[in-house]
């Protein structure tokens, strides 16, 4: 069964690669005129989905770029476990590392230029060997990884040693690939040291802590007092030890961080969201509550697949994993992998910067509070919590499909970060490959984060009665036919989960795709050696 139909996403397929949301909002946006569009053949039968997400075949030989991306993803997951998932920060750290790798590689390409030193690192033709590329990439990855993840410096050193390199070789002698890699990384690091993200905690306005806010943001509302219902307010989580914690707005200053390809964070700022009391917002809130009460096993799986878990690499990491699928599918060379990962990593960083500028500008709340306000004192059908399925509750008790320790991401809703990042990354993948076709299948376990200890009958219970019409197996296969559809699914997962209203997602997808369309000629210019 086709994933889109099984999700009942209200999507109308108007061509092999272009999808429209119900209502007619064109999310594909305009295509750069110099890029030929080849939608390819969208897979129709489940048997045709032989590309399994995150499962390389026995004969697969990863390129050096693919291997270092694996190290980057693992380091990012370790950081998320240490600090909770921080999608803005993760997107930047990945872009820093992938840009360093690209710049080191470019020194050994015939035409490509780096982002910081242009063509000044170009090595003579006799030095442009595969081995030199791999060594330069390794040192660039190592230096930049230690910069962005200093708490894991020893672990990262061991990864470099395991690949046969000396982490104490800090040479910047350009006649050696070690020197090229170190020099390329040092230039990117210096450029990003004070880029508005406040990584070191020493930028004006911060409190001295890494990545601390530099803008003095304070929420209009508190968990105990609503001053303005449209505005964001912290949500109390379980701390896992019997108490509660109400995290503040994660990196509210992120719109001030320096983007890669965008001129300004507000360059494509979306229009204002629907306001409190409007028919549009009322409709969006009712939709969230209705969907929450009727989640299928497949829909729950989609929520968790796109959310990832405690070891999350964020949407940047997730889309880089999709890019790895493409690498395996298309039998990429090292050169292709370096360029693809560089483009995906940077467009997602820019997407988060633009998204956070919108979040800070509009400062909107989340369904967690809005549903409770609108349906307070009313009995509604809703998800009752792990293993309870659908039950009737007072509207003031409504909650998303999520564990108690992470009910909703701690930042405003408009626009959705998942949707914005997915819109950008999916479009770059389409432009890079020349086709919207993806053709992957993700094999997941339903409820593995939220309801791991319950049977499918308990998960799908209704009013206290276990379901008798669901399969015993929790295995769900999610079919991802196109990059566009995968982005739509990522956005829809936030509505199904109860973290966002539809408007957050629709405008996020549009924003992300505008960013990608604007950025693509810049990436191509770096590849072609014509970047200024």
Predicted regions and their residues:
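Bacterial N-terminal signal peptides that target proteins for export
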Residues: 2-14
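Acidic/polar surface patches and capping/hinge elements
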Residues: 32-532
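Generic secretory/membrane-interface signal
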Residues: 6, 19-20, 412, 498
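C-terminal segment of classical bacterial N-terminal signal peptides
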Residues: 18-27
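Short, flexible helical or helix-coil boundary motifs
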Residues: 11-14, 18, 152, 381
């Amino acid at each position: 069964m086709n994933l889109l139909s099984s999700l009942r996403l209200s999507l109308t397929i108007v061509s092999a690669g272009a999808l429209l949301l119900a209502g007619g909002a064109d999310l594909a946006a305009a295509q750069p005129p110099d890029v030929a569009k080849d939608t390819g053949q969208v897979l129709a039968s489940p048997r045709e989905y032989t590309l399994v997400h995150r499962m390389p075949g026995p004969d697969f030989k990863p390129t050096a770029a693919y291997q270092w991306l694996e190290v980057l993803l693992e380091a990012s997951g370790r950081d998320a476990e240490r600090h909770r998932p921080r999608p803005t920060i993760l997107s930047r750290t990945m872009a820093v590392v992938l840009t360093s790798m690209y710049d080191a590689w470019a020194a050994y390409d015939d035409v490509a230029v780096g982002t910081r030193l242009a063509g000044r690192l170009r090595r003579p033709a006799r030095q442009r060997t595969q081995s030199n590329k791999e060594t330069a990439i390794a040192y660039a990855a190592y230096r930049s990884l230690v910069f962005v993840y200093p708490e894991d410096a020893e672990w990262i050193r061991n990864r470099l040693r395991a690949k046969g390199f000396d982490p104490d070789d800090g040479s910047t002698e350009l006649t050696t690939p070690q020197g090229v890699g170190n020099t390329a990384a040092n230039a990117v690091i210096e450029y990003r040291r004070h880029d508005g993200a406040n990584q070191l905690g020493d930028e004006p306005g911060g409190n001295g802590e890494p990545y601390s806010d530099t803008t003095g943001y304070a929420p209009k509302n508190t968990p105990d007092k609503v001053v303005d219902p449209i505005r964001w307010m912290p949500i109390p989580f379980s701390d896992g030890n019997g108490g509660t914690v109400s995290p503040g707005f994660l990196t509210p200053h992120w719109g001030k961080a320096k983007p890669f390809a965008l001129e300004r964070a507000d360059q494509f700022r979306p229009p204002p969201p629907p306001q409190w009391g409007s028919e549009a917002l009322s409709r969006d809130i009712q939709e969230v509550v209705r969907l929450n009460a009727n989640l299928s096993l497949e829909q729950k799986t989609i929520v968790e697949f796109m959310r990832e878990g405690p070891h999350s690499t964020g949407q940047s990491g997730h889309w880089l994993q999709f890019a790895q699928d493409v690498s395996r599918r298309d039998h990429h060379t090292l050169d292709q992998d370096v360029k693809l990962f560089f483009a995906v990593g940077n467009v997602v960083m820019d997407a988060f910067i633009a998204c956070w500028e919108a979040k800070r500008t509009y400062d909107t709340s989340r369904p967690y509070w809005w549903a409770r306000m609108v349906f307070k004192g009313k009995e509604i059908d809703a998800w009752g919590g792990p293993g309870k399925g659908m039950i009737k509750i007072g509207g003031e008790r409504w909650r998303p499909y999520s564990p108690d320790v992470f009910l909703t991401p701690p930042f405003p809703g408009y626009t959705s970060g998942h949707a914005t990042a997915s819109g950008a990354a999916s479009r770059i993948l389409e432009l890079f490959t020349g086709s919207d076709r993806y053709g992957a299948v993700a094999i997941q376990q339903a409820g593995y984060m939220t309801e791991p200890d319950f049977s499918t009958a308990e998960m799908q219970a209704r009013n206290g009665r276990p379901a008798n019409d669901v399969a015993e197996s929790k295995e769900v296969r999610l079919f991802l036919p196109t990059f566009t559809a995968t982005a739509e699914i990522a956005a829809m997962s936030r509505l199904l989960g109860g973290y966002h209203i539809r408007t957050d997602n629709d405008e996020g997808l549009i924003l992300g795709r505008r960013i990608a369309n604007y950025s693509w000629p810049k990436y191509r210019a770096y590849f072609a050696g014509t970047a200024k």
